[in-house]
Amino acid sequence: MKKSFSLLEIILVISLIGFLYTMFLPKTKINHIDELSSKLSLYLTHLRYKALIDDKYDSKDSLWHKKRWTIKFLRCRESVGGIYYTIYSDKNKSGHPSAEDSLKDPLTNKNIYTSNICNENSLNSKYVLLTKEFGISDVQISCNETTSVGQLSFGSDGEIYSKLSAFNNESNEDFFLDNERLW
């Protein structure tokens, strides 16, 4: 008479218990707002760090302030609809962000950028597409003084600015007198 379990019986019972456990395990829903807030928090910390180590001030360049590191929330084309954001330093001072100007995601090394076409691609982070990825239809920034949905720019002194000035800057003091500074 056989008084012990065979290896096959033990494996079968463990597999059955594992299967039943996964069937009745409560399903956890992914909270998109938490995911977005953690991504934005990571990106803002990285952006501020980048601005602190990358001083854009140049006394010979009257448009130096356009090169500040900036996060800008924008609307997709009307045919597409939605909202996206991009993080960039406008190196050519054109006023329009480009993939070359954008900050890289520190985790995936993808550009934190998209154009107003709002298509996902392998070079850019998918987390910038707020409407497509997270279902967000509106963003309100109380300090917005631009034509975009919202914008925050970081100076090398750690200050946050609500807009990039269009004024010519004679000196640093004149710049602070002409621009709104957020504390």
Where are the language model's segments positioned?
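N-terminal helix-rich module
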Residues: 19-45, 49, 53-183
